[in-house]
Design a protein with these regions (language model features):
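Catalytic cores of nucleotide-sugar-dependent glycosyltransferases that transfer UDP/GDP/TDP-activated
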Residues: 1-505
Length: 505
């Protein structure tokens, strides 16, 4: 199959979150399965042009109001892909739209005021790029709201009777990475799309007199999915649907969840370059060394008998930090005061939470935190901790709980989203499970579940060791996820009555 990934981010070029990792990893693994994959992203100011190849001639993209936007196009080979199965990355270089600090906003402007124009142009330019390189995909795979207008252009412009017909056999798949971000702007921005106001309503842009880019993509794509099966079900109910639950119920027959994978070349205790000693489920000596190094790094007393609970997180409401660190009601103080454990945290985010956390570290001898992010330290926390705490309010997929399982670190999580699909709750009677789960997000439920894990550490140690080995045996490879995406692509082509050109390997 010919597959075109349309995204605002892809590592190592542009990243604000897990979207960037997913797009690159999925593309590389689809290519390994024998498919022809290309990625298109904007060339932001932060992307160094010196490592890119400039394609000849500027590219014109006609927009609404008689405007024609001109851009340069650069290309590069995706690092990590093989020479036998390369992945080409194309960069749309529009100096006014993308030649600035930040992807969606900067320190002065949380959300750039021209974001609807920036990413509407990007979505239209994708089709001009295909014409420029004379390559037309079987599948256009759009990711999150910045790419959501691409399926709209495909359905209402490029596949219509009046079009040139190059995309008549192209289908679209739309992936939701986080339903909380939808690209909602004033509808005055819509004229720039050049699609006509009848399409505004037909495509589903209309959202209480605003323009909702993600909603339009979800209405217009041929099939849609999200990044875990359980999150797909959750988003169809009002409490988790961010006002789009009705759309997702309407598209229910075409909506599914596919769990993200993880990169075992990076997150693997048998290969990890950031930990003091490699280890595996057959020889756990390296985990003990990592625990010792972690205690030293955070200035905690070296003690192999006391459990360490680790956290690597964004300090935002989505991650449950209010219930854990809220100054009047958070449970972190009580947990550290009442339980014989050590708690370490690496994170950055809301200012109030950073201040509260640093205050707690000065008052509690068994709680230590570092504000910021460090790749090396995040690996050490995953390897050296005994438990990993994720009290998320909602979690589309979640990666840290999967990293934890691979490292034999048992997750303590709320049963939401992808956490339900990846963690099996502990059974006191049989010792089965790979982690500890709670249903309702509250300070008391976090306290009780951490207490449950600490109780098991001191009173059911043989179960803890069995859970570790069971956790380390779980397979979260991207190859498995890639095969599920191929099945989704084939189902989409079949739905549209387009004959398959390549079989799944």
């Amino acid at each position: 199959l010919k597959i075109l990934m349309v995204s605002s981010e892809a590592v190592p070029y542009a990243k604000t979150g897990g979207l960037a990792d997913m797009v690159s990893s999925l593309s590389i693994n689809l290519a390994k399965l024998g498919h022809e994959v290309k990625i298109v992203i904007p060339r932001y100011y932060s992307v160094d042009r010196s490592g890119l190849k400039l394609l000849p001639d500027a590219m014109g993209t006609p927009m609404g109001g008689g405007i024609e936007e001109w851009s340069a196009v650069y290309t590069a080979d995706m690092p990590g892909a093989t020479k036998k199965n390369p992945v080409k990355v194309y960069f749309i270089d529009h100096e006014i739209f993308f030649g600035r600090d930040g992807i969606y906003g900067n320190a002065l402007e949380t959300d750039f005021i021209d974001n609807p124009r920036r990413f509407t142009f990007f979505c239209k330019a994708v089709f001009q790029l295909c014409r420029k390189i004379n390559w037309f995909p079987d599948v256009l795979h759009a990711h999150d709201w910045p790419a959501a207008v691409a399926p709209v252009y495909l359905k209402f412009a490029e596949r219509t009777a009046g079009s040139a017909g190059e995309f008549k056999d192209t289908v679209s798949v739309m992936t939701i990475h986080n339903l909380g971000y939808q690209g909602v702007y004033h509808k005055d921005n819509y004229d720039y799309a050049g699609l006509g106001w009848d399409v505004f309503y037909k495509a589903g842009f209309e959202d209480w007199s605003m323009m909702n880019m993600l909603k339009a993509g979800l209405y217009s794509c041929d099939k849609l999915n999200t990044v875990s099966p359980n999150y797909a079900e959750e988003t169809k109910i009002q409490v988790h649907g961010f006002r789009l639950d009705g759309v997702l119920r309407y598209r229910s027959a075409d909506y599914s969840g596919i769990l993200n994978g993880i990169d075992y070349n990076v997150w693997n205790p048998e290969k990890d370059k950031y930990i003091p000693q490699l280890y595996s489920s057959k020889n756990m000596e390296g985990k003990a060394k990592a625990k010792e190094a972690l205690q030293k790094e955070f200035g905690l007393p070296a003690n192999s008998k006391i459990p360490i609970i680790g956290m690597v997180t964004r300090l935002t409401d989505q991650k449950g930090v209010g219930e854990l660190f809220g100054p009047a009601y958070g449970s972190a103080w009580s947990i550290c005061r009442d339980m014989d454990l050590q708690l370490v945290l690496l994170g950055t985010g809301d200012t109030w939470c950073e201040i509260e956390i640093m205050g707690l570290t000065s008052r509690l001898s068994n709680f230590k935190a570092k504000i910021g992010y460090s790749e090396k330290l995040s690996h050490l926390i995953e390897a050296g901790s005994d438990f990993f705490l994720m009290p998320s309010r909602y979690e589309p997929c979640g990666l840290n709980q999967m990293y934890s399982l691979v490292y034999g670190t048992l997750p303590i999580v709320r049963s939401t989203g992808g956490l339900v699909d990846t963690v099996e709750n502990f059974n006191e009677k049989t010792g089965s499970g790979t982690g500890f789960m709670f249903d309702y997000l509250s300070p008391s439920s976090i306290y009780d579940t951490v207490g449950w894990a600490v109780w098991a550490w001191y009173n059911r140690r043989e179960y803890i060791e069995k859970m570790r080995k069971r956790a380390m045996a779980v397979n979260f490879s991207w190859e498995l996820s890639a095969k599920k995406y191929i099945k989704l692509y084939e189902e989409t082509l079949k739905k549209q009555g387009i004959k398959l050109k390549v079989n799944v390997q």
